[in-house]
A protein has these predicted regions:
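Hydrophobic, aromatic-enriched alpha-helical segments typical of multi-pass transmembrane helices
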Residues: 1-185
Length: 185
C-alpha cells in the first residue's frame, strides 16, 4: 500500500468513527431526555463525551478546508460541551443554553462542508439550517414559542450527516487532494 492509499483508508476510518460517535451522541442524548435522575445525568455525560469525539475527528477532517474555521468550530463545540458537563454535574448554572454553541458549531460545519470537495453540498445546507434552529435558543422566549419545530432542522441535519458518514464516509481521494492543496496532511 502506498502513502496515498494509507491516507485514504485513514480518513474514511476517521469519518466513519465520527459517524459512530455522532450516532452514540444522538442515541444517548435522546435517552437522557426520557430518563430521570442519575441515569439521565449519566446518559447526558456519555452523550457529551461522544460529542467531544465528533469534534476532534471533525477538526481533523475539515482542517484541509479551512484551518481557522475548523478550529473555531471545535472551540464552539468544546465550550458547549463544557457548559453541558458543568450544568449536568450542578457545578455551575448555564448562563446560556449550550445549544447556542452547538448552533454555531453546526453553522460552521455546514460552511466547511459547503467549501469542501469530499462531502455533498446538501449536507452543508442541512447542517447550516440545523445551526440556525439551535441558535433560536439565544432567546428562551423565542425558542419556547418555536419548540419543537426549531429543533427539527438540527435533528434532520445532524441525523443525515451521521447516516452519510456511517454509510459513505467521505470521498477520500477528494479529501487527499484538498489536503495536499492546503498543505495539511
Amino acid at each position: 500500500m502506498d502513502l496515498s492509499t494509507d491516507a485514504e483508508v485513514s480518513v474514511r476510518f476517521d469519518a466513519r468513527l465520527a459517524g459512530i460517535f455522532y450516532l452514540l451522541n444522538i442515541l444517548t442524548g435522546a435517552s437522557a431526555l426520557v430518563a430521570h435522575g442519575t441515569l439521565a445525568s449519566a446518559l447526558l455525560l456519555i452523550s457529551t463525551v461522544c460529542y467531544v469525539g465528533v469534534t476532534i475527528l471533525f477538526y481533523h477532517l475539515f482542517r484541509p478546508v479551512d484551518r481557522t474555521m475548523s478550529g473555531l468550530a471545535a472551540l464552539c463545540s468544546i465550550i458547549g460541551c463544557v457548559i453541558t458537563i458543568l450544568d449536568t454535574l450542578h457545578l455551575a448554572a448555564a448562563p446560556v443554553s449550550p445549544l447556542v454553541f452547538f448552533g454555531l458549531y453546526c453553522l460552521l460545519i455546514g460552511y466547511l462542508i459547503l467549501r469542501s470537495t469530499f462531502l455533498p453540498r446538501f449536507l452543508g445546507v442541512l447542517m447550516a439550517l440545523g445551526g440556525l434552529g439551535w441558535l433560536t435558543f439565544l432567546s428562551p422566549s423565542l425558542s419556547s414559542k418555536l419548540s419543537p419545530w426549531n429543533m427539527a432542522p438540527g435533528i434532520l441535519g445532524e441525523g443525515t450527516l451521521t447516516l452519510w458518514l456511517l454509510v459513505a464516509a467521505v470521498n477520500a481521494r477528494q479529501w487527499l487532494e484538498q489536503s495536499n492543496i492546503s498543505g495539511v496532511v
